[in-house]
């Protein structure tokens, strides 16, 4: 009986592994997408029809904002009945305190949903709406001081504007727009606004906008409609807009929601995104739980905390191809199969992914367990045995009629601290069938690896000593977090890994009484020949024979390059109960700045986009203005990246942890500037480097992180001690790096790369031409005109002088007596003299 059960179990496991493997081929017949397709392509735009803004209400008790809505271009039966009005202050106002009157005119009754940010409570606000319309307030405190009244507004822009002026004296803003689901209005007054509001067509202002979503044509197919443990969706975008010459990076939003309002939807998702243009994929998920992994060759970002209902990880893969056939083959070859859907859109900047609830997944386990194996974890699913085993065997086997072997996991501590969450009465306490959420531990799973973990309200920082790897025989390693794009930085002594609390695969759970435990894992991997799959557990691509049953090769014999090792770490945070004055950030009286220059004189900083040629010099000046003379700063990190997001690291590093990494870095010694204000001064640091053509793109970004340091021996605010770059290359430890991360400021400067040959001023070689090229000096226009005018005046004066000489010498020669009988030689001489004297002015000028 026992033998039959063991054979049945092995057959069951083998069938599960076989059915989970990649399909031998993928068939996908493209057709225009319809409403049933899971992915929809849209174009999001922000515009208004007409409008104006003014500062006419600055001396009056309230602001007046007028919204005149027009009917949208919709078919019969599709009239929109709800509008969300987003209100927040203009950029020059932090918290808005002034009373406001809103005139909300619409061609049909509407429900206005109000969403506000940075508007003070307790301030009078009046909403005048068309007949039949209502206003719903999202905040109860806001509604206490707000009133709503129905009015019969006049028709037409000018009539409505004149009505508002007659009623309130002046108007702050007037906006005409078609009915939209989302309208964004920024309240506040600015001196730069004109004195009166004069309505103009194509009114363009970031303060008054409406959002419109227009469906765009796309093609796609549903490859696999069967319920799967994970869904794989491939989206290919040809261009983010209709302008083929646009070089700016565009945000492409992926909006993930359930297709219908289910009680709860849990999914494992993989998104493979492809666009040849420079785009930034922004992933947002709502009302869906589970794991989401995003793969793209472009920049990947996630929405705000309220827009991330799933556990999100990302992987930037440069080897993702284009076209339908190659993308499907790439997904199959990399283990992302079966593919659920494929979608290609010529033009779009937004995609909606709607998920069906075709599979129930438990909250506690993101990785679902096949129903056939549920009996191994749930003893209640087994039939009651007539003669159950008793004694030690029953305790060891959990009531099963056969022994189940222990499955070791590489780098796990004994005692089962790193296990799946179990039912109250687990069958086999040591069983390890599938990866799951790990219990937080200070450090798990690596032998003799010394690390330290720090965390604050924004990020976690892990420092791992390099010597501990070398002592354990691990040379030449690559360290990442669960998200493989979050790679370790290095200095002379440590690997440094940084993770935001909501990124890089970091998870969290509540701990008593009011704390939060954040945990992640360090993935230790030898330099691979290709990119890994990047799943958080590192066990996605299990080959046949890796199931851990007897007969397999011992995991201790497997080379490190074939199986990554995980080191789990965690950090606990609790809210500060008694904040003291010493905990105030030292940056409250500090101002940072960074400028780029074209020469080492550092005279006039470059404005706008900085143009740099290949192998040309870039001169950088960073400065800090502070009141504390013992406060210093350092250039912690500088790198060049094709992405504007400073969190996206790049291999082109100029400075790392104060230490220069590029051999062309040269530092300069600027003078300290003292201000007339007592105890105020500005410290500057200057350096230059030679720009190398590493990236094949014309728009790059110089990212620099500045950090505060102290010149004192003891610092109450726990700032790191200021060190020189040469010293930082050898003596920087984990505690100093952690302290620097707490008070850093990031600057981003765009660089426009000029792709042409530029003569590099360097030392000449023997092969170079010893004859220097001729140098042509040019003059400006005014100088040339001055020289020409002076030459004209000189020529005129010279001509007049010659005429004067001619007129006087000609008269005297004509009055001379002629001898009556001169010799023949004298006659010819006299005739020749007379002929010469009676020449033209030009010939006289030539003779002279």
UniProtKB/Swiss-Prot annotation:
Segments of this protein annotated with the region Disordered: 390-448, 813-848
Annotated segments matching region Interaction with TGF-beta ligand: 736-750
Extracellular compartment segments: 21-784
Alphabetical list of SMART domains matching this protein: ZP (SM00241)
InterPro entries given in the database record: ZP-C, ZP-C_dom, ZP-N, ZP_chr, ZP_dom, ZP_dom_CS
TM stretches of this protein: 785-806
Residue ranges, compositional bias (Low complexity): 833-848
Cysteine pairings via disulfide bonds: 52-197, 638-704, 659-729, 709-722
Keyword flag Glycoprotein: yes
Major site of localization recorded for this protein: membrane
Role played: Cell surface receptor that regulates diverse cellular processes including cell proliferation, differentiation, migration, and apoptosis. Initiates BMP, inhibin, and TGF-beta signaling pathways by interacting with different ligands including TGFB1, BMP2, BMP5, BMP7 or GDF5. Alternatively, acts as a cell surface coreceptor for BMP ligands, serving to enhance ligand binding by differentially regulating BMPR1A/ALK3 and BMPR1B/ALK6 receptor trafficking. Promotes epithelial cell adhesion, focal adhesion formation and integrin signaling during epithelial cell spreading on fibronectin.
Subunit structure: Forms homodimers and homooligomers. Interacts with DYNLT4. Interacts with integrin ITGA5:ITGB1; this interaction promotes the internalization and trafficking of ITGA5:ITGB1 into endocytic vesicles. Interacts with TGFB1, BMP2, BMP5, BMP7 or GDF5 and inhibin A via the ligand binding domains. Interacts with ALK3/BMPR1A; this interaction results in the cell surface retention of BMPR1A. Interacts with ALK6/BMPR1B; this interaction enhances BMPR1B-mediated stimulation of the BMP signaling pathway.
Listed name of the protein: Transforming growth factor beta receptor type 3
Gene name per UniProt: TGFBR3
